[in-house]
């Protein structure tokens, strides 16, 4: 359907200019219509990208390691950018990026969200001054629910109040940067999540040093990874490489200790060594003998049961990555040792029998990457010593012409393989275990204003997963197309077909569709209308959503207002709607049942851009029920209303 739609409109698209690609467009394409279990640590990954979007990189001065944080950019593309700057001088406009070999259409669309181009005169005239200037930001956020959950009204229940509080700040001076964060979740009695980091960056042999909280990723993330993205975008998103400070609010997926990146240039390529050492306490559910049954990742400590799991097991991780790069070839090896001060005993349930057991775990991997102009190949093979399991992942990307990209991702993850710090693309979540599969990917922009992207994926899971008592298969096909007939209008459509065994050993087929129209008569105003549908087991869930964005000419004031009507049979037929959120957070709502959702966000920024104030109010009205949620999270009533406020000071 999308292909016919694209071909019918092809002759109308020539010479037209696409609407600006916004942060909301990016998040929508990355998050909506994806299962929670398929998303893995996607929200934390999007949250880190939100911080990068709010503090874009100067493309003319950013180090290669920094540019590799930008989604869609490959190592080859980063090298081409630096080569272009070396030969032709600083990049002056975004349009100049089209002249750089290796920059695809997808990169050209996403890059403006995460980079900035500073005028060359300012770069030369203020170079020394900028380095010596102290810069930073501090923000405080609070969320206030205008309702009570059952946990606040019964005893025993939640110990604290229902408010959410968060502090976060960063300081930067010359080559040093430091940051801190603290958070209190609803239901907790006090701030119980703290963290910070100190990072030093140099251009000599010691490229980067991070003390405190950090994240790390090497190769394809099979041993240790810091973010993965599956689905329509998995082939254009490169896995995060190296070390970087922990800037988000996640309470589980990070390391705490010290790490460094050392690089030496030789006559036969560049050598890099990245050692790391981490020790921290993790939340865990213990059995009667004091063994670890489950590692908890939500960071919630509201009830006595949850507080009993708080920091109950110590986790040590030590290792590093050794890499070598020469022209078009990169080779590397990763080794890591993990140890817990309590043994892991996940239980005898069938799906838990492949979970890691014991207290000592060792891993080793080899990774590679090579680029031949329009062909890029990369991959990793990993081995876990305690159970003798293998895992392999490869990515092949071919760009025969600038406006066409083809991809292939074969993978094999033995059910005997495991790594508690891994993060790699899988059909379910981001844990590379118990899966083999292959994905085909296609992305093209035949003419300006028309683009088409599709992928097909098949995976096999030999060991029973949670809720399934047999081996299982999953097949997925997804396609999306975008058409911009003029600078003011844009049409977008997505269809997904999914077939496989689900919980309860039931074979199901899902059809999901999303149609979207955007109208932007001028830069300060935009209107977006979306129609969503989800069909499974001969029942249909659907929703209609609209969003209006407006801002003043001086950009001091901005507002976003949205409304959604949803009508689904049950949770199986749920729909997803992205909702603009406060600075430094991501809001991707899941709706089931029958109801209406409305939200509004207003932002004010001072003329000198030092002060920022954001306020958001969201309300959901359930038509089909007077009781929402279950257990201690139950809400007695049809309404669910929240108010969030954020204040930021930058200097």
Features from the language model and the residues they span:
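Bacterial N-terminal signal peptides
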Residues: 1-8
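Exposed, low-structure sequence patches enriched in small/polar residues
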Residues: 153, 158-162, 268, 313-348, ...
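Outer membrane beta-barrel
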Residues: 187-283, 403-420, 558-571
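C-terminal extensions
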Residues: 17-69, 107-166
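Transmembrane beta-strand segments of Gram-negative outer membrane beta-barrel proteins
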Residues: 126-153, 171-180, 209, 218, ...
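Small-residue hinge/turn detector
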Residues: 74-78, 104-105
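Outer-membrane beta-barrel proteins
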Residues: 181-194, 245-251, 308-311, 382-384, ...
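Boundary at the C-terminal end of the N-terminal hydrophobic targeting segment
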Residues: 13-15
